[in-house]
Amino acid sequence: MGDGALIVAVAIKGNNSKTKGVVRWALQEFASQEHVVFKLLHVQPRDSNSVSTTRKDLTTSVYKKDVDRKTREMLLPSRDMFVHREVQLDIMVLESDDIADAISKAVQDHGISELVIGASSSIIFSWKLKRSNLSSRIADATPRFCSVHVISKGKLLNVRKSDMDTETSIADDRSESRFSSDSHSGTVSSTSSHQFSSTPLLFQRIQALTTVNQKVGTNIGKQNNEPHHHHHNRAGSLDVDESKLLNQKGFYRTSSSGIGYGGSDISSWRSSQMEEASSSSTYSDPTSSSSQIHKDFELEKLKIELRHIKGMYAVAQSEVIDASKKMQDLNQRRSEEATRLKNLTIREEEADEVVEMERERQEDAENEAELVRECIERETEERLEAEARAEEVRKEKQRLEDALEGGPLQRQQYMKFEWEEIVEATSSFSDELKIGVGGYGSVYRCNLHHTTVAVKVLHSDKSSLTKQFHQELEILSKIRHPHLLLLLGACPERGSLVYEYMHNGSLEERLMKRRPNVDTPQPPPLRWFERFRIAWEIASALYFLHTNEPRPIVHRDLKPANILLDRNNVSKIGDVGLSKMVNLDPSHASTVFNETGPVGTFFYIDPEYQRTGVVTPESDIYAFGIILLQLVTARSAMGLAHSIEKALRDQTGKFTEILDKTAGDWPVKEAKEMVMIGLRCAEMRKRDRPDLGKEILPVLERLKEVASIARNMFADNLIDHHHNAPTHFYCPITKDVMENPCVASDGYTYEKRAIKEWLQKNHKSPMTDLPFPSDSLLPNHSLLSAIKEWRSQLIK
């Protein structure tokens, strides 16, 4: 910094519009000058001793850091304004309880030649009459070699020159200094001004007092309009004494602004005085006339100053009350903050103890984790080596198979069985092993490769050996769905298919209460919640077939006889292998009509398919609707839709009579909802049938949830009253049979919901009382399958 640099200090208090106005004025006034250095001053109070003694060193440091951070954030907008103008800036944050003294010392120590400050709220009354505001005290305390600029609303309000001239002028910088008054007061004409050339200072003082009186009167009027009734009473007592003096010269007080004039304002009075002076100059001594004018002026000046003092008194009284209230609030906040600080200190000590304990536990856990990590690394290396060796063996085996079979494209996706194996397993197709006869062939139960399977032997005709049979067999071998009958293998040369065996027969046998054969006992009826679940399973399998890519698969022969049930009454659709892959392009419709006759069972065939021969996914929707009606009623498909519609139209409660009573107590609302879906699916025109994915599946999904809840309640009742589950079926935490068993990292199996809640509150195993190595949970599928099978046996 050069010796000839101009040092300009800008003192700010906070971050508001007043501060921005002060900074903006300083930049506009001094930034264009050469060799100028700006200093941004901010004074913050010192921390009291009472507070510092109650804090610990750590808390005091945190408190100071927080104060410094808030100060930087407060000064940031002002700093950015200086940076934007690309001027040299130093930021000085002073700590002192006396703002004026701190700024004075900074001006003295740094040789500041220009000081820019903001005006206090009460400075509008008078710079000379009120010296108690902060701006005045700063100006008085500042050394005389420094000029002080007082800014209000972005404008220059007052300047204290550095040449020791203490005279100040109170004027609005937007108006020019001229000898004039407003439209209500009139003007002093130039023709009469020569008569008072002997007293120009007198009229200048009258003009200044008039301007000040108007501004102060307006401000006091605003103060009086506010609802401070307790101030008005005291001010009113002063007005009574003042009115006697004002009436002598024609002055009075108005209700709107607090100060007014009767008949004419001060300019009118001034004009009358000039006329009196002019007339008296002819008949009296000029010296005595001038003396009388000075006396009258001094009297009027005292009256105006009296009004100023009373106005400032009212404002000061209001400020004192506000300051007192703020002081009470600050004391209350200080007490609350002290209590809060004490509580925080106690909590901090407790937290330190907990942290120390956790640190010790962490060290122990890290040591244990290190041992586990080393074991895992060794096991991982061994596993990777084993996988690498297995991959090499697999590739070699694959290479040999490709060489033997002529390439990967010729490999079959299903197991090939020799015809002799099938003949031997079925005891030369013994009638004792026959479990069903269909339109395409007979079905036998037998054992192949130590597995119970169902072998369908197609009727021996030429169609079974065509290219279409092999194409459909290839497609079927690639389809996998939980509710589609699984194809295990085939003997393509003889048109034989090998499926997984379904122990509980077909849905038709369970609904119509028919035994598969004479030797088997009568199966129990399906309960209503199982029927809701079966309906959803069939719909999900159909949706899988209909959304197949690149072309949908239509079953064409969907009926209860082709829906099979396993040990747990889980349903699977059979005869998928003889389904039809259709092209939804309308140009192929005639081809389907000419080459394909109606296929399927009469009461389940789509009426439009019967009429046109066109195979579409909606054909399966029609058959599915009939099946839904049979699930609810357990009646024959013939005329079923018509009889149900008739029962629904009857208001005498016949709907409950068509429900299958052997299924238990039906929920009437849900049963009626399923019947309505079935009737919509069985509409005569396919365009009137609902969409499987958007309309049917969401409804059945909701019904399945209702059925799942009812099934669990039914099973729990059986468990509580009649049966005891195996001990490993119970959760160690809830002591109930698990519905979703999961293996935790301690090696024990828990109910998933219960162990998750345990892990949120505890880190030790409820069985071993040792820390969990990790929070991972693995589903125990084998145990879940065993629990489901056990529940199914209970329900049966």
From Swiss-Prot:
Residues 171-181 have a biased composition (Basic and acidic residues). Keywords: ATP-binding, Coiled coil, Kinase, Nucleotide-binding, Serine/threonine-protein kinase, Transferase, Ubl conjugation pathway. ATP binds at residues 435-443, 456. Residues 298-407 form a coiled coil. Residues 182-195, 270-291 have a biased composition (Low complexity). GO terms for biological process: protein ubiquitination. It comes from the Eukaryota. Residues 163-195, 218-240, 270-292 are annotated as: Disordered. Pathway: Protein modification; protein ubiquitination. Its EC number is 2.3.2.27, 2.7.11.-. One of its GO terms (molecular function) is ubiquitin-protein transferase activity. It catalyses: L-seryl-[protein] + ATP = O-phospho-L-seryl-[protein] + ADP + H(+); L-threonyl-[protein] + ATP = O-phospho-L-threonyl-[protein] + ADP + H(+); S-ubiquitinyl-[E2 ubiquitin-conjugating enzyme]-L-cysteine + [acceptor protein]-L-lysine = [E2 ubiquitin-conjugating enzyme]-L-cysteine + N(6)-ubiquitinyl-[acceptor protein]-L-lysine. Residues 429-700 form the Protein kinase domain. The active site is at 557 (proton acceptor). Residues 724-796 form the U-box domain. It holds the Pfam family U-box. InterPro entries: Kinase-like_dom_sf, Prot_kinase_dom, Protein_kinase_ATP_BS, Rossmann-like_a/b/a_fold, Ser/Thr_kinase_AS, U-box_ubiquitin_ligases, Ubox_domain, Znf_RING/FYVE/PHD. One of its GO terms (cellular component) is chloroplast. Functions as an E3 ubiquitin ligase. Belongs to the protein kinase superfamily. Ser/Thr protein kinase family. This is U-box domain-containing protein 51. It comes from Arabidopsis thaliana (Mouse-ear cress). The lineage of its organism: Eukaryota, Viridiplantae, Streptophyta, Embryophyta, Tracheophyta. The gene is PUB51.
